[in-house]
């Protein structure tokens, strides 16, 4: 029996999700559209194989071809980011961060990381996350007037609290991060430096954002987002000693068997990112985001956090529309534009409502959108948020979205 006929509930849901992605404008900054090669690798026969251990040192037989796949991913990751060592087995960015902490600090140690509401990540010390429960996190944020990182304040906090580790990187921060400054601050207080480049890895690979690898003791990342690979994690270092700790922290520390079909997807994505065309794509991602900023900066109801973007994302306060982030997300979803509600610096609302939304351009750029298309999308967002109860406006925006998705299909 055909598997789709056997399980129609499952395959109908998958078909509807495929339809949603085809007909919606995906503006969630952490999402992208993988290539057919990445998708094929993830759906390959490698999903059948267990391979605990590392290439050449497996606990299972029959891994000779699995070793080739994993070594391809490792070697390509090292070349892509200029690192001496790479671990490609982490199932996610959070798993990568967990392994980094296990390799660098002990439970109860003090760590300096970016506050979640200022743009950090759950794994950078949020009290509801394992990181905040296991380590003594002290948070830094952004300057109230500029909404960018104040490195002088980071230095003051580091001198005051003497952390064993400083974490740089963010999940909702639109400006360039100065990793050299972070390294200097870490050295002043004899701290290690970890960089979580999950959101900007593709831009780093393309030379469009400073590379943290020369400055950090350990760099972690996801392999999706701007890198346009499968959902997974990556850990890089130039230290052989730390590489050994990272490997043992991943296996047997926090994981068992690696997902070799996902690692194959990573290898495929890394090869794509090494091609010169990927740098052109990354440049377009930034150009599209910066084109959108002009629209939001001209709309009096919208407030662009920090006033600009240097990367793929924009953080926008929407309270000027008389809305919170949850409401704005729902309104935009109703016209087939997908964003996520997001806290803003010095947030006054709960994380379930928020004052802002986060917008990213990786997915629409993968579909082929250029600056003029990004401008149109930004104008549609402003149009519907200004008049959320007007059904005529909804219909007009929906029609414009449909025209754009038809012009730029998900897969040509």
Curated annotation (Swiss-Prot):
Annotated Gene Ontology cellular component terms: cytosol
Protein's pathway: One-carbon metabolism; tetrahydrofolate interconversion; Amino-acid biosynthesis; glycine biosynthesis; glycine from L-serine: step 1/1
Top-level EC class as recorded in UniProt: transferase
Residue(s) at site: Plays an important role in substrate specificity: 224
Gene3D superfamilies per UniProt: Aspartate Aminotransferase, domain 1, Type I PLP-dependent aspartate aminotransferase-like (Major domain)
Disulphide bonds in the chain: none
Catalytic reaction equation(s): (6R)-5,10-methylene-5,6,7,8-tetrahydrofolate + glycine + H2O = (6S)-5,6,7,8-tetrahydrofolate + L-serine
Cofactor(s) the protein requires to work: pyridoxal 5'-phosphate
Swiss-Prot/TrEMBL GO biological process terms: glycine biosynthetic process from serine; tetrahydrofolate interconversion
Keyword hit for Transferase: yes
Keyword Cytoplasm: yes
Main location: cytoplasm
This protein's UniProt keywords: Amino-acid biosynthesis, Cytoplasm, One-carbon metabolism, Pyridoxal phosphate, Transferase
GO molecular function terms attached to this record: glycine hydroxymethyltransferase activity; pyridoxal phosphate binding
Cellular localization per UniProt: Cytoplasm
EC number(s) recorded for this UniProt protein: 2.1.2.1
List of residues binding (6S)-5,6,7,8-tetrahydrofolate: 116, 120-122, 241, 350-352
Pfam families tied to this protein: SHMT
N6-(pyridoxal phosphate)lysine sites (modified residues): 225
Entry's family note: Belongs to the SHMT family.
UniProt-listed NCBIfam families: PRK00011.1 (NF000586)
Self-association and partners: Homodimer.
Biological role: Catalyzes the reversible interconversion of serine and glycine with tetrahydrofolate (THF) serving as the one-carbon carrier. This reaction serves as the major source of one-carbon groups required for the biosynthesis of purines, thymidylate, methionine, and other important biomolecules. Also exhibits THF-independent aldolase activity toward beta-hydroxyamino acids, producing glycine and aldehydes, via a retro-aldol mechanism.
Record-linked PANTHER family: SERINE HYDROXYMETHYLTRANSFERASE, SERINE HYDROXYMETHYLTRANSFERASE 1
Protein name as annotated: Serine hydroxymethyltransferase
Organism field: Enterococcus faecalis (strain ATCC 700802 / V583)
Gene: glyA
């Amino acid at each position: 029996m055909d598997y789709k006929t056997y399980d129609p509930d499952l395959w109908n849901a998958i078909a509807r999700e495929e339809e949603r992605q085809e007909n919606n404008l995906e503006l969630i900054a952490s999402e992208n559209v993988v290539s057919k090669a990445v998708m094929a690798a993830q759906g390959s026969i490698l999903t059948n194989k267990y391979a605990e251990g590392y290439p050449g040192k497996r606990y299972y037989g029959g891994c000779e071809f699995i070793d080739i796949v994993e070594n391809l991913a490792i070697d390509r990751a090292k070349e892509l980011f200029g690192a001496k060592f790479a671990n490609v087995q982490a199932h996610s960015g959070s798993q990568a961060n967990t392994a980094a902490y296990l390799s660098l600090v002990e439970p109860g140690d003090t760590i300096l990381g970016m506050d979640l509401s200022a743009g950090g990540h759950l794994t950078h010390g949020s009290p509801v996350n394992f990181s905040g429960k296991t380590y003594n996190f002290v948070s830094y944020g952004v300057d109230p007037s500029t909404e960018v990182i104040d490195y002088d304040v980071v230095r003051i906090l580091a001198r005051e609290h003497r952390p064993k580790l400083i974490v740089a990187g963010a999940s909702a921060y639109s400006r360039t991060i100065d990793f050299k400054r972070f390294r200097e601050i870490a050295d002043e207080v004899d701290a290690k430096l970890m960089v979580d480049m999950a959101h900007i890895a593709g831009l780093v690979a393309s030379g469009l954002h400073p590379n943290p690898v020369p400055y950090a003791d350990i760099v972690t990342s996801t392999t999706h987002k701007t890198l346009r690979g499968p959902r997974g994690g990556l850990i890089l270092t130039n230290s052989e000693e730390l590489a050994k700790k990272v490997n043992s922290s991943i296996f047997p520390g926090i994981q068992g068997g690696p997902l070799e079909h996902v690692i194959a997807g990573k290898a495929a994505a890394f090869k794509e990112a090494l091609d010169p065309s990927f740098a052109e794509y990354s440049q377009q991602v930034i150009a599209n985001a910066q084109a959108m900023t002009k629209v939001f900066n001209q709309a009096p109801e919208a407030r662009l956090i920090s006033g600009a973007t240097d990367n793929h994302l924009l953080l926008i306060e929407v309270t000027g529309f008389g809305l919170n982030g949850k409401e704005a997300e729902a309104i935009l979803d109703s016209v087939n534009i997908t964003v996520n509600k997001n806290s803003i610096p010095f947030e006054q609302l709960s994380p379930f409502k928020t004052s802002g939304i986060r917008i990213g351009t990786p997915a629409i750029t993968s579909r082929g959108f250029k600056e003029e298309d990004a401008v149109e999308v930004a104008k549609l967002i402003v149009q519907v948020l200004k008049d959320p109860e007007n059904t005529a406006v909804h219909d007009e925006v929906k029609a414009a979205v449909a025209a754009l998705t038809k012009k730029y299909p998900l897969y040509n």
